[in-house]
């Protein structure tokens, strides 16, 4: 029974925390497989065409030179097919080995050796930190941490570095790199109903207007917006209205379209689609884990205005995490536990809660430890009471 519960907990942990660890390399493998299939099918069709042409030529009385030329063409196409097949298989093999490496790493979680389990947990923490740093844009720090911890094969650095190139190009107000990324992932972006490529084409149109290249803008619109429909058609109509206004217009909505802040919106849109493409959440696993941990121990006592009930051992009570945990829900506790303010021990039948005349409750063992001459001093109010005045508290 315990083994089944442990397996169930591990399965839940993998689904919640380790999903990106396996999903990203799997999606990469899937993408490379589809690309390899297309490349091999295309090159095979080329070989088939030149072979058919050779057979057609041989059915007559061809000259030797023409046959040699056709044979050279067949050899060339076969060489290209072989090269493309080898490259595709190598790329697939790399992705498959990466998936296997990560699966083997996750299996180490159930090790019976405490030392091995401790090392695995440390690596998991490092992996979370690397991903969080990558999301925050600290690429060099993330790469150094991954290299130092020996987890380069266990984190999705390549995906984030590719995203970095795209984002940097958008910051330079260039669309070519992002459009190339859209082309590489065209089929999946279409299934996601992504509007990123359309937004990029709109921005290119806006930049042509900004440069006062209106004829080029019209040609651009005819080329890329002829198939627009629905909400996209409304955006096209709005953008086309810019042709009648100067680049420095103060009339809305054309002033808003010319706002350079649109490039920042494109970066945000790219990030959103990139995460969706790899089935990642908008927040890092580190952020989600930290929030879950803070919420699990957050109580109303952590936010008392006088600060008298705050515990130095409570992470939520600390200054650095108190504000971060403020919007999070309180801990769910089906059965309450009373904790002594003096010792931090749980008050139960072996350490019954005792109430002083001023209404403050402490554990019996703690009152014994601070009793002097049959008197106790309340740590909160500094009032002095006889030990016999403390009354046992009963919880219904």
From Swiss-Prot:
A GO molecular-function annotation: zinc ion binding
Residue ranges constituting the CTLH domain according to the UniProt record: 159-216
* SUPFAM superfamilies hit by this protein: RING/U-box
UniProt zinc finger (RING-Gid-type) residues: 314-381
**Compartments, record wording:** Cytoplasm; Nucleus, Nucleoplasm; Nucleus matrix; Cell membrane
Question: InterPro entries of this UniProt entry?
Answer: CRA_dom, CTLH/CRA, CTLH_C, Fyv10_fam, LisH, ZF_RING_GID
Report the EC number(s), separated by commas if there are several: 2.3.2.27
What's its catalytic activity? S-ubiquitinyl-[E2 ubiquitin-conjugating enzyme]-L-cysteine + [acceptor protein]-L-lysine = [E2 ubiquitin-conjugating enzyme]-L-cysteine + N(6)-ubiquitinyl-[acceptor protein]-L-lysine
Q: Name one Pfam family in it.
A: CTLH
- Positions where Phosphothreonine occurs in the chain: 28
Cross-referenced PANTHER family, in alphabetical order?
A: E3 UBIQUITIN-PROTEIN TRANSFERASE MAEA, MACROPHAGE ERYTHROBLAST ATTACHER-RELATED
Job of this protein = Core component of the CTLH E3 ubiquitin-protein ligase complex that selectively accepts ubiquitin from UBE2H and mediates ubiquitination and subsequent proteasomal degradation of the transcription factor HBP1. MAEA and RMND5A are both required for catalytic activity of the CTLH E3 ubiquitin-protein ligase complex. MAEA is required for normal cell proliferation. The CTLH E3 ubiquitin-protein ligase complex is not required for the degradation of enzymes involved in gluconeogenesis, such as FBP1.
Name of protein: E3 ubiquitin-protein transferase MAEA
Instruction: Give the encoding gene's name.
Output: MAEA
């Amino acid at each position: 029974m315990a083994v089944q519960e442990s397996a169930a907990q591990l399965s839940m942990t993998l689904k919640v925390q380790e999903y990106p660890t396996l999903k990203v390399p799997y999606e990469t493998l899937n993408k490379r497989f589809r690309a390899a299939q297309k490349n091999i099918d295309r090159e095979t069709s080329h070989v088939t065409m030149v072979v058919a042409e050779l057979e057609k030529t041989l059915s007559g009385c061809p000259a030797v030179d023409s046959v040699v030329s056709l044979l050279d063409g067949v050899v060339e196409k076969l060489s290209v097919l072989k090269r493309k097949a080898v490259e595709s298989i190598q790329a697939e093999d790399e992705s498959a080995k990466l998936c296997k490496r990560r699966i083997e790493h996750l299996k180490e979680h159930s090790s019976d050796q405490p030392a091995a389990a401790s090392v695995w947990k440390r690596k998991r923490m490092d992996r979370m930190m690397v991903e969080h740093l990558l999301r925050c844009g600290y690429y060099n720090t993330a790469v150094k941490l991954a290299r130092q911890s020996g987890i380069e094969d266990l984190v999705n650095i390549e995906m984030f570095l590719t995203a970095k190139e795209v984002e940097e190009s958008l910051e330079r107000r260039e669309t070519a790199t992002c459009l190339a990324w859209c082309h590489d992932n065209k089929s999946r972006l279409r299934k996601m109903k992504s509007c990123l490529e359309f937004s990029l084409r709109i921005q290119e149109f806006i930049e042509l207007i900004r440069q006062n290249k209106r004829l080029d803008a019209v040609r651009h619109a005819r080329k890329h917006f002829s198939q627009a429909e629905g909400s996209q058609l409304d955006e096209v109509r709005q953008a086309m209205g810019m042709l009648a206004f100067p680049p420095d217009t103060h009339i809305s909505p054309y002033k808003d379209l010319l706002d350079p802040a649109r490039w920042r919106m494109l970066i945000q849109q790219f990030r959103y689609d990139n995460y969706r493409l790899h089935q990642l959440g908008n927040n890092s696993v580190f952020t989600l884990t930290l929030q879950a941990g803070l919420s699990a121990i957050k109580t109303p006592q952590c936010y008392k205005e006088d600060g008298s009930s705050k515990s130095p051992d409570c992470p939520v009570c600390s200054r650095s995490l108190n504000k971060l945990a403020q919007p999070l829900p309180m801990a769910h506790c089906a059965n309450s536990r009373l904790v002594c303010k003096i010792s931090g021990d749980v008050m139960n039948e072996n350490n019954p809660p005792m109430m002083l005349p001023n209404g403050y409750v402490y554990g019996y063992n703690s009152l014994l430890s601070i009793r002097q001459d049959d008197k106790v001093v309340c740590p909160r109010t500094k009032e002095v009471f006889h030990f016999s005045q403390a009354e046992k508290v009963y919880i219904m």
